[in-house]
Amino acid sequence: MSPYKRIIDKAWSLRKKYINYTATNVFRLVNSYGDALPEVTIDVYDKNFLIQYFKPYEEHTKNKISIALNEIFKPENITQKTRLKGEDVETRLIFGPEIPKDFVVVENSIKFNISFQDGGGTGLFLDQRDNRKKIQTLSKGKELLNCFCYTSSFSVYAGLG
């Protein structure tokens, strides 16, 4: 088993028990240093995977990571974004059909439109899923001003609280 396949498989075994597939089809699979892949995140959007690199990686390393994902999950699509400081974001379709510009995902039974093509990420920060759920609980009967929003996901959760 390749080292990247081992890392991704370990990350998956740690997280799969926390995903409620009847209510959620998006989650962070690999979270950078915490999963022994420095400056790399891998997010799952239904059957589509987004790999984001925040430091330079050699192409052969990127290929090995994509191959490991494909061997473990057989995704419909793998998209890669390279987000280096001071440079434009580079988005590349690694394989599969291009994802439609307005792609709908579900998190905690709430639907969101995301885009793999716009901006640095998709606008839905998957590492904030639990915080959004907490806002939903804490905001019940209160008013909330969300001054720093991209997809307004925190506001949507607050409105449903």
List each model region and its residues.
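Non-catalytic substrate-recognition/targeting regions of SAM-dependent transferases
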Residues: 30-36, 41-43, 59-125, 133
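Solvent-exposed alpha-helices and their adjacent loops that cap or buttress functional pockets
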Residues: 21, 97, 136-138
